[in-house]
C-alpha cells in the first residue's frame, strides 16, 4: 500500500546524499573540521556543540559519541552539548532564546576550543550568536548548515553545507552521516 511512498522517500534521501557527495569541497570541509577538532583535543581543548530541535539532538549525539565511544573503545574526548535544561530555561527567560548558546560559550569556552553549531537553514539566531561569542573567545568554529547556508554562510571557520532546499529532515540525514565521519576521522587523528 505504501511501497511507492517508501521507495520515493529513500530515493530522495539518496539523491540528496549523492548531490552532497558530488562536490569535492564538501569532502575537504569534513576533513578540515575533523582535523580542527582533533588539534583542539591534542592541546587539551574541547568542543561545544549546539543546535535547535532535531539539530539539538544531533549536537547531543555528537558530544555523546565523543565522550563515550563511536565504534571502537578508546579514551573519551572532551565534547559538551549545550543542553542543560536549567541553563537553557534560565537564559531564555532572563535574556531571550537567541542567547541560550552564546552565554554558555562565554562562560565555558576558551581559546583553542571549537564550537560545532548545527542549523539546517543557517539562520538560527542563537547559533549565529554562539559563533560570534566563540570567535570573540578565540575559539575555532564549525557550522553544519543546509540550503544556501543562510546567514551563517561564510561566518564559521569551516562550513559544511548540504545544498537541499526541501524539508529539513533530508539535511539532518546528511548531517548525522557527516557527524559520524568526523568522529571516525578524529579517532584516526588521535591514534
UniProtKB/Swiss-Prot annotation:
Catalytic activity: 2 D-sedoheptulose 7-phosphate = D-glycero-alpha-D-manno-heptose 7-phosphate + D-glycero-beta-D-manno-heptose 7-phosphate
E.C. designation(s): 5.3.1.28
This protein's pathway: Carbohydrate biosynthesis; D-glycero-D-manno-heptose 7-phosphate biosynthesis; D-glycero-alpha-D-manno-heptose 7-phosphate and D-glycero-beta-D-manno-heptose 7-phosphate from sedoheptulose 7-phosphate: step 1/1; Bacterial outer membrane biogenesis; LPS core biosynthesis
Residues holding Zn(2+): 61, 65, 172, 180
Residues that bind substrate: 52-54, 65, 93-94, 119-121, 124, 172
Coiled coil location: none
Gene3D superfamilies (alphabetical): Glucose-6-phosphate isomerase like protein, domain 1
Domain of life, source organism: Bacteria
GO BP terms, alphabetized: D-glycero-D-manno-heptose 7-phosphate biosynthetic process; lipopolysaccharide core region biosynthetic process
Claim: Ribosomal protein is one of the keywords in the record: no
Keywords linked to the UniProt accession: Carbohydrate metabolism, Cytoplasm, Isomerase, Lipopolysaccharide biosynthesis, Metal-binding, Zinc
Cofactor info, note text: Binds 1 zinc ion per subunit.
Cell compartment(s), UniProt: Cytoplasm
SIS domain ranges (all copies): 37-191
Subunit and partners: Homotetramer.
Family membership: Belongs to the SIS family. GmhA subfamily.
Classification via PANTHER family: PHOSPHOHEPTOSE ISOMERASE, SEDOHEPTULOSE 7-PHOSPHATE ISOMERASE / DNAA INITIATOR-ASSOCIATING FACTOR FOR REPLICATION INITIATION
Other remarks in the entry: The reaction produces a racemic mixture of D-glycero-alpha-D-manno-heptose 7-phosphate and D-glycero-beta-D-manno-heptose 7-phosphate.
Record's function text: Catalyzes the isomerization of sedoheptulose 7-phosphate in D-glycero-D-manno-heptose 7-phosphate.
Protein name: Phosphoheptose isomerase
Species the sequence originates in: Vibrio vulnificus (strain CMCP6)
Gene name of the encoded protein: gmhA
Amino acid at each position: 500500500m505504501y511501497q511507492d511512498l517508501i521507495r520515493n522517500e529513500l530515493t530522495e534521501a539518496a539523491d540528496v546524499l549523492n548531490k552532497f557527495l558530488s562536490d569535492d569541497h564538501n569532502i575537504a570541509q569534513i576533513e578540515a573540521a575533523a582535523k580542527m577538532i582533533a588539534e583542539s583535543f591534542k592541546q587539551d581543548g574541547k568542543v561545544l556543540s549546539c543546535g535547535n530541535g532535531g539539530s539539538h539532538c544531533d549536537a547531543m549525539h555528537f558530544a555523546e559519541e565523543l565522550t563515550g565511544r563511536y565504534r571502537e573503545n578508546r579514551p573519551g574526548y572532551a565534547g559538551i552539548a549545550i543542553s542543560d535544561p536549567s541553563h537553557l530555561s534560565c537564559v531564555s527567560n532572563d535574556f531571550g532564546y537567541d542567547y541560550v548558546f552564546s552565554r554558555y560559550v562565554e562562560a565555558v569556552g576558551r581559546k583553542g576550543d571549537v564550537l560545532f553549531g548545527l542549523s539546517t537553514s543557517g539562520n538560527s539566531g542563537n547559533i549565529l550568536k554562539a559563533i560570534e561569542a566563540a570567535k570573540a573567545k578565540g575559539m575555532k568554529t564549525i557550522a553544519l548548515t543546509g540550503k544556501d547556508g543562510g546567514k551563517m554562510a561564510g561566518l564559521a571557520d569551516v562550513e559544511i553545507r548540504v545544498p537541499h532546499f526541501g524539508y529539513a529532515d533530508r539535511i539532518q540525514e546528511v548531517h548525522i552521516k557527516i557527524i559520524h565521519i568526523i568522529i571516525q576521522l578524529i579517532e584516526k587523528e588521535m591514534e
